[in-house]
From Swiss-Prot:
Residues 475-546 form the PAS domain. PANTHER family: TRANSCRIPTION ACTIVATOR OF GLUCONEOGENESIS ERT1, ZN(II)2CYS6 TRANSCRIPTION FACTOR (EUROFUNG)-RELATED. Residues 19-37 have a biased composition (Acidic residues). This is Transcription activator of gluconeogenesis NCU03938. GO terms for cellular component: nucleus. GO terms for molecular function: DNA-binding transcription factor activity; DNA-binding transcription factor activity, RNA polymerase II-specific; RNA polymerase II transcription regulatory region sequence-specific DNA binding; zinc ion binding. Transcription factor which regulates nonfermentable carbon utilization. Activator of gluconeogenetic genes.
Length: 740
C-alpha cells in the first residue's frame, strides 16, 4: 500500500518518522510492535524527503546511542505530542508541520514550592538561538485550543487570552533579544493599586493616570508583582540553569541592597515618547543623572509621603511620575547605558543609609542645569520655606530609629580640646588633694609616658587636633549607647581623667549626678575620703624615699597676693564656683588613684588591647550639709549607747545614720535618709526601699569597696583617647552591710 499514500498522509508520516529518530525528553519507550510499524512507515517517507538517503537507525533501548541536547522549555505542540523540541522559536518541528505562527512555550506543572511564584518568574532563560523578530508573548497559565490561521504579528498567541499589556521598554529604545516585546498583566491587581491601566492603551502617553479613591487609603507594596520591571534581570549573564533560580537571586539582591531606601522621585522616568507605558533607555529603574531631589525634605518628608498623596501626581507611586518605589539592585551590576539589568549609575548620588542621615541635609544635584529638567509640579515644592518643626521629623520618628544624629558631631566641633590645660588642672588637683608621696608617684607615672606623647603629637597640626576631637566625640557617641544598656555602673573618661560619659547605675551607686560629673552643675562634694590607716600605709610606700610629706603649694603668680590670705581664699572660692568636669582622681581615694595611674602608664602605649582588673574605693557624693547632719546623727546615736552601757561602740555611719537595723533608727535620722532618697534618680517608693536595703547602703565612712575593670581605646594616631571603666560593688557580710 505505499503507492496509495497521499500528500497529507505523507506529511503526517514525515512528522511521525522524525519522532522515531528524535527522542522524548521524558524518555518514554514504546512497544516493540509499534517500533516495527513506525520503522516500516518511516522508510517510505524518508525515501521521499531525502531522495533515497536513509538515516541511520538507532535502537531506542541502546544506552550508547547519541543523545540530543534537550531544550530548556518545549513548545506547546511538542509538549502535547511528547516530542523533543528546540530552543529556537518557532522550533524546527513546528515549521515543518506548518505551526510556526502558533509556536509558544508550553505550560509546565508547578512544583509545590513554586505555587506562590508569579507566572512571569517561571519563564525560560532565553538562549542564544532566540529569534527576536518573532512575536512571542509570555504565557499566563491558561490553555486555549490552537489555531493555525492566527496572525504572526499578534502579541498574544492563540493559546492565551488577551490582557492589558505593559511593555517594559519603549519602541524608541534599542530592541533586546533577551526580553519579549510585550508582557501581559491583568487589569486589576489587589496587591498593586499603583499600576492602573489606562482606559485605552492605544491612545496617547501615560501622563497622569487615574487612581481610584478606595485604593488611595492603602500604602503601596514595596515589591509589586504586577510591575513588569521587577522581573527584568540580565538572566543571560547570571549563568543560571533555571529561570526561577535567577529570579530568586535577583529578588534577594533587591531586598538586600535597597529595601531600606526611600522611594526615589524620578521625574525623568515620566518623559516618554511612545504611546505605551514604557521605561526610558537609561534603565528599567531609571537610575540616570539628577533623579534625586532630596532624600528627606523638611516639607515633603517621609511622613507626608506615607500619610498624604500628592494631588499633582495622583498618588505616591503614580504612573505620571513613575515613582514605583522599587529599590535599586546593586547585586546585579551592569553598565550605565545597559538596558538588560536594573543597574545604578556610578555618577548619580544614592542614599547610603537609612537612619543616620541628617534631617537638614542639602539637596542632591547631579550636574549644573539639572533644575531645568524637573517637572513643574516639583519646582514649587523646593521653594517652600523650611519649618523647624518638620525638620525634626525624619525616618527615625516613623520607624523607631534612634533620634541622635552623628553628623552633628562633625558640624559642632570647630576647635581642638585643650588637653594641656586639663593636665595642668589635674596636677594642681593632685597637689591640693593628696600627700606629697602620692603626688610624686602619680607624676612619675605620667612622666614615663610623656616621651611617647611627644613623639605622637609632634607631627600633628591644628586640623589633626580637630579631627582627633571629632574622633573622640564619634567614639563616645557609640560608647554612650553601650553604657546605657549595661547593667553595671560605668563611666568614660578622657586621657586626662576628665569624666565624659556616665550611666544611671553609677549615679545610683555613688550619688554623683551626671550634671556634676560632666561639669554642667557646680561640684559641692565635701567628701575627700578622710585619712585612715590603710591609706597612710599604702601612701608611705611610694613617694620620695618613702617620706610622707605635706601637700605642696604652688607659688603664686603675683608675689603680693601670696601674703594676703584673704585674696587667696577669694581666688580659690571663685575657682570652685566655676563648673568643670570632674576628674577621676576626685571619685576615688588616694591609694586607688595612685594605683590607677601606675596601671595607666603600663597600658597607655604598651598594651593596646590590655585590660586591668583591680579593687578600689569610690567616694560617695556628700555635700557639707550632709556631712554635718551625719555627724550630728552619729553623736545623737552614740549618746544613748554610752549611757546604757550596751550596744556596739564602733557603729558606722550610713546615709546620715548608724549602721543598724532599720527598726532601730530614731526619728532624727529619718529626715536625713528621706532627703537622700528624694535626691535619687529612682521613684519615691523605690528610693525608700533602696535607702534601707539597696545599693546605696554598701559604704563605710563615705567609701564604697568596688572591683573595677577598665581599658583604653586609642585613636588613629595611636594616642590614648577614651578610658572605659566598669564598676561592681563588693559586699562584705563582716562589715555589717545589708544584703542587696
Amino acid at each position: 500500500m505505499p503507492d496509495d499514500v497521499g500528500p497529507a498522509e505523507a506529511e503526517v508520516s514525515g512528522a511521525v518518522s522524525e519522532s522515531d529518530n528524535e527522542y522524548d525528553e521524558t524518555e518514554v519507550t514504546t512497544k516493540d510492535d509499534d517500533d516495527e510499524k513506525m520503522a516500516e512507515r518511516s522508510v517510505a517517507s524518508e525515501g521521499v524527503e531525502t531522495n533515497g538517503d536513509q538515516k541511520k537507525k538507532y535502537d531506542p533501548k541502546d544506552p550508547l546511542r547519541p543523545r540530543r541536547k534537550k531544550a530548556r522549555r518545549a513548545c506547546y505542540a511538542c509538549q502535547r505530542a511528547h516530542l523533543t523540541c528546540g530552543d529556537e522559536r518557532p522550533c524546527q518541528r513546528c515549521i515543518k508541520r506548518g505551526l510556526a505562527e502558533a509556536c509558544q512555550d508550553g505550560v509546565r506543572k508547578k512544583a509545590k514550592y513554586l505555587h506562590d511564584a508569579p507566572p512571569e518568574a517561571l519563564r525560560p532563560v532565553l538562549g542564544p538561538n532566540y529569534n527576536p523578530a518573532a512575536a512571542v508573548s509570555v504565557r499566563n497559565g491558561h490553555r486555549h485550543p490552537s489555531n493555525a490561521g492566527s496572525d504572526a504579528g499578534s502579541s498574544i498567541g492563540t493559546f492565551y487570552s488577551q490582557s492589558t499589556q505593559y511593555p517594559v521598554f519603549s519602541s524608541a529604545a534599542t530592541q533586546l533579544g533577551s526580553i519579549p516585546e510585550n508582557l501581559p498583566f491583568p487589569q486589576q491587581s489587589p496587591v498593586s493599586p499603583t499600576f492602573q491601566p489606562s482606559s485605552n492603551p492605544q491612545l496617547g502617553s501615560i501622563g497622569v493616570s487615574s487612581v481610584s479613591s478606595p485604593m488611595n487609603s492603602f500604602p503601596p507594596a514595596l515589591f509589586d508583582p504586577s510591575n513588569p520591571a521587577i522581573f527584568n534581570f540580565n538572566l543571560e549573564g547570571l549563568n543560571f540553569g533555571s529561570q526561577y533560580g535567577a529570579m530568586e537571586f535577583g529578588m534577594l539582591g533587591h531586598m538586600s541592597s535597597g529595601a531600606a531606601e526611600t522611594p526615589p522621585r524620578d521625574p525623568s522616568m515620566a518623559q516618554q515618547g511612545t504611546s505605551d507605558v514604557g521605561f526610558n533607555p537609561s534603565g528599567v529603574f531609571g537610575n540616570g543623572l539628577n533623579q534625586f531631589e532630596k532624600v528627606y525634605d523638611n516639607n515633603t518628608g517621609l511622613i507626608s509621603d506615607f500619610l498624604t498623596l500628592d494631588a499633582h501626581s495622583n498618588g505616591l507611586y503614580s504612573q505620571g511620575n513613575l515613582q514605583h518605589g522599587l529599590p535599586h539592585a546593586y547585586a546585579i551590576p551592569a553598565g550605565p547605558t545597559s538596558l538588560q539589568s536594573p543597574s545604578t549609575e556610578n555618577n548619580s548620588p544614592q542614599p547610603t543609609g537609612f537612619g543616620f542621615e541628617s534631617p537638614t541635609a542639602t539637596n542632591y544635584t547631579g550636574v549644573p542645569g539639572a533644575a531645568g529638567n524637573q517637572p513643574g509640579s516639583q519646582q514649587p515644592r523646593a521653594q517652600k520655606p523650611k519649618t523647624p518643626a518638620l525638620g525634626k521629623l525624619g525616618p527615625q520618628s516613623v520607624l523607631g530609629k534612634r533620634q541622635r544624629d552623628p553628623s552633628s558631631i562633625y558640624e559642632a566641633v570647630k576647635e581642638p580640646f585643650q588637653y594641656v590645660a586639663s593636665f595642668h588642672k589635674l596636677i594642681s588637683l593632685l597637689q591640693n588633694r593628696f600627700s606629697g608621696a602620692s603626688t610624686i608617684s602619680i607624676v612619675r607615672s605620667l612622666a614615663s609616658i610623656r616621651p611617647s606623647f611627644m613623639s605622637c603629637m609632634k607631627t600633628l597640626n591644628r586640623a589633626d587636633l580637630i579631627f582627633m576631637e571629632k574622633s573622640f566625640q564619634r567614639a563616645l557617641f557609640e560608647h554612650e549607647e553601650f553604657m546605657h544598656q549595661s547593667p553595671s555602673p560605668a563611666i568614660a573618661c578622657r586621657r586626662t581623667g576628665e569624666i565624659a560619659a556616665v550611666n544611671k547605675e553609677f549615679t545610683a551607686l555613688t550619688g554623683w549626678t551626671k550634671d556634676v560629673l560632666l561639669g554642667k552643675t557646680l561640684n559641692l562634694n565635701a567628701n575627700m575620703g578622710g585619712t585612715n590607716s590603710d591609706t597612710l600605709s599604702i601612701s608611705s610606700k611610694g613617694g620620695r624615699g618613702g617620706i610622707v610629706g605635706t601637700t605642696p603649694r604652688l607659688k603664686p603668680l603675683h608675689p603680693e597676693q601670696g601674703t594676703n590670705a584673704d585674696s587667696q581664699q577669694q581666688q580659690s572660692q571663685q575657682h570652685k564656683e566655676q563648673p568643670q568636669p570632674v576628674f577621676l582622681a576626685e571619685l576615688m581615694d588616694e591609694a586607688s588613684v595612685t594605683q590607677f595611674y601606675e596601671d595607666y602608664a603600663q597600658l597607655a602605649f604598651t598594651h593596646s588591647r590590655g585590660t586591668v582588673v583591680r579593687k578600689c574605693r569610690l567616694l560617695k557624693y556628700r555635700t557639707q550639709e550632709n556631712m554635718d547632719a551625719a555627724a550630728a546623727a552619729a553623736a545623737a546615736a552614740s549618746a544613748p549607747t554610752a549611757s546604757g552601757g550596751s550596744g556596739s561602740s564602733n557603729g558606722t555611719v550610713v546615709n546620715g545614720g548608724p549602721d543598724s537595723s532599720p527598726a532601730g533608727k530614731t526619728e532624727k535620722e529619718r529626715p536625713t535618709g528621706v532627703n537622700v532618697a528624694s535626691n535619687s534618680i529612682l521613684s519615691n517608693r523605690v528610693a525608700k526601699i533602696d535607702g534601707e536595703h539597696g545599693i546605696s547602703k554598701l559604704e563605710r565612712d563615705g567609701k564604697l569597696e568596688c572591683s573595677y575593670t577598665w581599658t583604653i581605646k586609642r585613636d588613629v594616631f595611636d594616642i590614648p583617647m577614651i578610658i572605659m571603666i566598669n564598676f561592681l560593688p563588693c559586699y562584705y557580710r563582716s562589715h555589717n552591710q545589708l544584703a542587696v
